[in-house]
Amino acid sequence: MAQGQQPILVLPEGTSRYLGRDAQRMNILAGKILAETVRTTLGPKGMDKMLVDSLGDIVVTNDGVTILKEMDIEHPAAKMLVEVAKTQEDEVGDGTTTAVIIAGELLKKAENLLEMEIHPTIIAMGYRQAAEKAQEILDDIAIDASDRDTLMKVAMTAMTGKGTEKAREPLAELIVDAVKQVEEDGEVEKDHIKIEKKEGAAVDDSTLVQGVIIDKERVHPGMPKKVENAKIALLNCPIEVKETEVDAEIRITDPSQMQAFIEQEEQMIRDMVNSIVDTGANVLFCQKGIDDLAQHYLAKAGVLAVRRVKKSDMEKLSKATGANIVTNIEDLSPEDLGEAGVVSEKKISGEEMIFVEECKEPKAVTILVRGSTEHVVSEVERAIEDAIGVVAATVEDGKVVAGGGAPEIEIAKRLKDYADSISGREQLAVSAFAEALEIVPKTLAENAGLDSIDVLVDLRAAHEESTYMGIDVFDGKIVDMKEAGVIEPHRVKKQAIQSAAEAAEMILRIDDVIAASSSGSSEEGMEEMGGMGGMPPM
């Protein structure tokens, strides 16, 4: 700079900027730290994490996406890996930990290639080629199956190591029945399976209700507690006298006018109730409020009514009973009513709940999850959600792959052969991608207390003979996973590898990180805090 020339500030004061290798090193390190955090939770022998938030609420889980959501992560590169886990959860419901640790390992291998002076663009290109080839290999080794036995095995594999060991089989039965029940034209709408959790009793006391459970109670004690052969009305409007939108005053000059006014209000409420009762409805679910007087008249008519039901529950009730949700009482007709064998109010763990059961061919069902404590019930709920996702994926795709690290080893083996056919430096990236996939069986072995090097060597040798050889973490042997019944949906692996590759590729392409200083804090303050959210300092 020439003497006396004024420095030019392009960025605001206090902004941190990292270029080139510094930016890549920092982002890769953040990704590796995040992957290491969830790595110990992988597999049937994976450990749990205890997460305590600022209010002292505790979550005990080994579900990858739950851990990452509960952690207060601020580093931008680490946040990208959290998005990988969320995408995996939304798409297939399982394989979140697998996706994150593969992404972390891809970044680790990329770091070695960067030190060999290989350009990030070449590494990214090689990773993309490897990911595309991996998808082809996965399609080739997939097993066509969607029979009940396969679905049971898929569900049990997904729940292994998630606090459901003793009740794996009965829970798998419930999940397969639930998915099969809501399936329509080969597609499964997972939102139509409601999971209602209540502490108390044992995990294997969990049940499947062919209908919907509503966590509400009757609006009036005079209403029947149980209605058989229920005719159900669903209303999305209040049963009360409408308030005027403008302020209005009524001048009363005579007490009889006041009485007439009150009687008119009562008559309006009575007419509303009569129009419901006249359709033949003996059960009413209302999304809005029900006036006290309307409750009285409904109780006199022997109608079981529930108010302020959630919109999502109303939609499930419609799917389960065949009722139409009506937004105007005057439009309610007998054709809009749904049917259920029994609607009753039951006490579960000291709380009243409404059970809508024995629906004919319901397209919405409920799994009532039980467990000894709130933490147990929450972890079982997460395991069931994962299992529903994988069973639904298997029903829709009709394809599965072996578990126990078998597909990763097979893909790695074939990718190494494929790498030899590639000219140029991309070959090194494809080989690195193949090695990165071996992190899955390696982690499964380490978490089971086995020697990961011995296991990997044995697995590679076994795959010269069979595609389906994987590690049985319970006895430490290499077995045929297909024969052992350890299988996973094809979609879970496909999505995990695809998401991990895309995230790693995106992070590698970043060569400049510009971080604006947060208001009221200095760069030194960030350094003292250990960078962003406990990640490498920026």
UniProtKB/Swiss-Prot annotation:
The gene is thsB. It comes from the Archaea. Residues 518-538 are annotated as: Disordered. Belongs to the TCP-1 chaperonin family. InterPro entries: Chaperone_TCP-1, Chaperonin_TCP-1_CS, Cpn60/GroEL/TCP-1, GroEL-like_apical_dom_sf, GROEL-like_equatorial_sf, TCP-1-like_intermed_sf, TCP-1_chaperonin, thermosome_alpha. The lineage of its organism: Archaea, Methanobacteriati, Methanobacteriota, Methanomada group, Methanobacteria. Molecular chaperone; binds unfolded polypeptides in vitro, and has a weak ATPase activity. The keyword Transcription regulation does not apply. Keywords: ATP-binding, Chaperone, Nucleotide-binding. Signal peptide: none annotated. One of its GO terms (molecular function) is ATP binding. Forms a Heterooligomeric complex of two stacked eight-membered rings. It comes from Methanothermobacter thermautotrophicus (strain ATCC 29096 / DSM 1053 / JCM 10044 / NBRC 100330 / Delta H) (Methanobacterium thermoautotrophicum). This is Thermosome subunit beta. Residues 528-538 have a biased composition (Gly residues). CDD domains: cpn60.
